[in-house]
UniProtKB/Swiss-Prot annotation:
This is Large ribosomal subunit protein bL27. InterPro entries: Ribosomal_bL27, Ribosomal_bL27_CS. Disulfide bonds: none annotated. Keywords: Ribonucleoprotein, Ribosomal protein.
Length: 82
């Protein structure tokens, strides 16, 4: 492979699309079952009561109620109070 750049070439010019991660429903908000609460990579937030974790670590509500953020030991957890 050439170690010098050819005429009019560049090593830059690539960027990935934003993945729209983050908290989608905040503490105190009323949600229905199936609503996405947090989109994340890895488990920054862990599922609490009435919350499950999807294959891509997304947290979603399993029941209708009010969102609550808290701690479960040292872990940050998201729960839904019915």
């Amino acid at each position: 492979m050439a170690h010098k750049k050819g005429a009019s070439s560049s090593r830059n010019g690539r960027d990935s699309n934003a993945k729209r991660l983050g908290v989608k429903r905040f503490a105190g908000q009323v949600v229905s079952a199936g609503e996405i609460l947090v989109r994340q990579r890895g488990t920054r937030f862990h599922p609490g009561t009435n919350v499950r974790r999807g294959d891509d670590d997304t947290l979603f509500a399993c029941a209708s109620g009010r969102v609550r953020f808290g701690r479960s030991g040292k872990r940050r957890a998201v729960s839904v109070d019915t």
